[in-house]
Amino acid sequence: MVLQMIKDMNLNLKVMQGVYIEAEMNNFGCPWGKVYSENELKNNRHQNLVKVKKLIKLANSYPDVIFSLSAGNEATVDWTDHYVSPEKVIEYVKLLKEGTRQPVTFCENYVPWHHKLEALANELDFLSIHTYPVWEYKHINEALEYTKQNYYGVANKYPGKPVMITEAGWATNANGKGIDPGNVSEDFQERYYHELHKWCEKENILTFFFEAFDEPWKGSPDANEPEKHWGVFYENRAPKRVMKPYF
């Protein structure tokens, strides 16, 4: 287990540990999601609770490694294929806060924080947003400014809450479905990475860059599917351009 290895080897690493909560409701607004039977949804609700309880155990077993907890990931945004109501997420958040000492968050696209997650935000210790300018057809030249708009839009709405970026990145390949192939490359990824890092360091914004390694299992069978190409390393662990200076 990764957490045990970090502890045993005394590695200078901290982890945000989260649960991936599955669909508890059908989201007919998701263009790629399936329609779940009531039995499937019932089972998902049960398994989600099991996952939350397991997270509580992990948090208490590795208090020096796990620095924060997330009650889910992209489960309330309009296009999600694993929809869970904000009210149910609040229940999971309360369970985590009652059973652990670590601060609790929920990782979500920046949009829902503006219009449907106010009650959830009040329960969280800090907010976590995802921002992907390239998915919203922004050119690399306007990418950082768009990220700033996404961030400050949420931060200014909740002035009493710390806000971190738990996903931000730039793909290195695309097939034209959702992302213009001319707007992705290792050069563009490198530029966005460094511009984002410089800004976040200046503003003291904790950020997770998405992501470490390519995930070829994601998305469609098309080898150029953009979901497969967000890593700063290839699947075989070879560094892409942005990481080559460090290896």
Range-by-range predicted roles:
Residues V52, S85-I90, E142-Q149, Q189:
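Charged helix-capping and loop-helix junction motifs
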Residues N10-K14, P63-S68, G99-V104, N122-D125, ...:
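Loop/turn elements at helix/coil->beta-strand transitions in domains of secreted/extracellular proteins
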Residues V77, D81, I129-W135, K157-Q189, ...:
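Active-site clefts of carbohydrate-active enzymes
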Residues V2-Q102:
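Substrate-binding cleft of extracellular glycoside hydrolase catalytic domains
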Residues M1-V2, V50-K57, C107-A119, K148-Y152:
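Alpha-helical scaffolding within the catalytic cores
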Residues P181-F188, W199-F247:
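Aromatic-rich peripheral "rim/lid" segments of glycoside hydrolase catalytic domains that contact
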Residues L13, Q17-V19, A23, F28, ...:
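Aromatic- and acid-rich polysaccharide-binding/catalytic face
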Residues V19, A71-N73, V93-H114, G160-A171, ...:
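Aromatic-lined carbohydrate-recognition surfaces of secreted/lumenal glycan-active proteins
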